[in-house]
């Protein structure tokens, strides 16, 4: 199925529904939720996902797992997707929060094949076997560190985090944050760990990586992205991206715009 709202087929007696969708660049899917769990795979572009526990950035070629019933919104930056909508009883991942997943070559091909299946596919035939293998591959997909958690119970720290996300820089120093909160640097680091589960440096890097992926998807040159984020050199920036994602920034740069039309507002 392609460019079809899941609401139109959600009633079908199938454990997994696969839908391919092309989105206009910059299209925002405002807050919504699905009865089924969702695996949202980006063939092209970058997806920016927001949910209760923070934000996730999903580079091209990777996917985000969204548990059943979780309210979320997604901004699409040059994105064509392949989604699986999975009955909660068949969900292959136990996560209670969103996760960005690394998509193997096998999982990618299975996703591309799945959207070619008819909605009421033969569960006892080839399509049923494909779905079974899909669920196994989703279950074993490794999680990537592309979640930007936000504090829930520390309003002052949350305000600083949100301000930083508007203009992240890798050269931001914890001493300045500590002064803003009128605490010692040691206390700041402890509050970060308690409220977010990451060190200041780890969270800062994730925020910068999220900004970088969005900028690269919009065609900003690698050198400009690196310098805007405060890296000493494009090489230092490229090293960080390779270490986290296993790919150079050039592999994440904007591709040809996706042909198509505006997709349904909630998918």
Placement of each model-derived feature along the sequence:
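Generic protein-terminus/edge-of-domain signal
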Residues: 1-46, 265-266
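Ligand-binding loop in jelly-roll beta-barrel domains
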Residues: 69-98
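Amphipathic alpha-helical segments enriched in hydrophobic/aromatic residues interleaved with Lys/Arg
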Residues: 91-162
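Short hydrophobic/aromatic patch on the recognition helix
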Residues: 61, 188, 192, 236-237, ...
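A short, Lys/Arg-enriched amphipathic alpha-helix from helix-turn-helix/homeodomain DNA-binding modules
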Residues: 126, 131, 144-174, 178-181, ...
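Terminal helix-turn-helix DNA-binding modules in bacterial transcription factors
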Residues: 175, 194-234, 238, 254-267
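Short acidic-glycine-tyrosine-enriched beta hairpin
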Residues: 53-68
């Amino acid at each position: 199925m392609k460019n079809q709202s899941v609401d139109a087929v959600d009633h079908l007696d199938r454990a997994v529904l696969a839908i391919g969708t092309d989105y206009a660049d910059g299209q925002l899917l405002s807050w919504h939720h699905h009865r089924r769990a969702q695996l949202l795979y980006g063939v092209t572009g970058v997806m920016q996902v927001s949910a209760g526990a923070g934000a996730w950035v999903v580079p091209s070629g990777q996917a985000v797992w969204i548990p059943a019933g979780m309210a979320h919104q997604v901004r699409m930056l040059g994105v064509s997707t392949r989604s699986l909508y999975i009955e909660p009883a068949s969900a292959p991942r136990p996560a209670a929060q969103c996760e960005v997943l690394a998509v193997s070559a096998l999982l990618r091909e299975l996703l591309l094949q799945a959207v070619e299946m008819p909605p009421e596919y033969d569960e006892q035939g080839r399509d049923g076997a494909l779905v079974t293998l899909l669920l196994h591959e989703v279950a074993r997909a490794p999680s990537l560190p592309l979640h930007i958690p936000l504090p829930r119970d520390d309003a002052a720290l949350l305000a600083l985090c949100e301000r930083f996300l508007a203009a992240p820089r890798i050269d931001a120093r914890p001493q300045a944050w500590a002064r803003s909160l009128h605490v010692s640097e040691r206390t700041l680091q402890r509050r970060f760990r308690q409220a977010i589960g990451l060190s200041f440096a780890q969270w800062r890097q994730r925020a910068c990586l999220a900004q970088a992926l969005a900028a690269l998807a919009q065609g900003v040159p690698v050198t400009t992205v690196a310098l805007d984020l405060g890296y000493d050199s494009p090489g230092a920036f490229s090293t960080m991206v390779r270490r986290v994602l296993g790919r150079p920034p050039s592999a994440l740069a904007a591709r040809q715009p996706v042909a198509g039309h505006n997709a349904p507002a909630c998918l």
